């Protein structure tokens, strides 16, 4: 374990209201040097349908910034994938479908989220609305994918 890593996380976390914060690590890594093209994930080479999902208030890393960056990269380069970039103002790091989180934690979900993330405490309704919107959009996409698959493979 790198001691400076955890020291920086502790410094950023202190007084933040979050159980843990680590955005400073990503901000510092980008300030330290330019990242070469070889280091960047070639998102345009991904086949299929992509959902790029994140929230502005993610306390672990700058999700929204990276989603905007991926969106821009896809706009500038040829690709065959369908994609949807979903950036929400509130949702915390756990921008997961509400139904998935409820299955993982059927009791105490709101308590846990509010304990871990200050944004979930400050904006509980908005965070829940984000999770429910993600749930609707991903469920609809999976239903469409399943229907397309069944129509394309009638013998299965």
Model regions and ranges:
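Mobile cap/lid helix-loop segments that gate and shape the active-site cleft of serine hydrolases
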Residues: 1-41
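Alpha/beta-hydrolase-fold catalytic nucleophile elbow
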Residues: 26-29, 53, 88-89
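Short beta-strand/loop motif that positions the catalytic acidic residue
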Residues: 46, 51-58
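Conserved strand-to-helix beginnings and helix N-cap segments that scaffold or border functional pockets
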Residues: 63-67
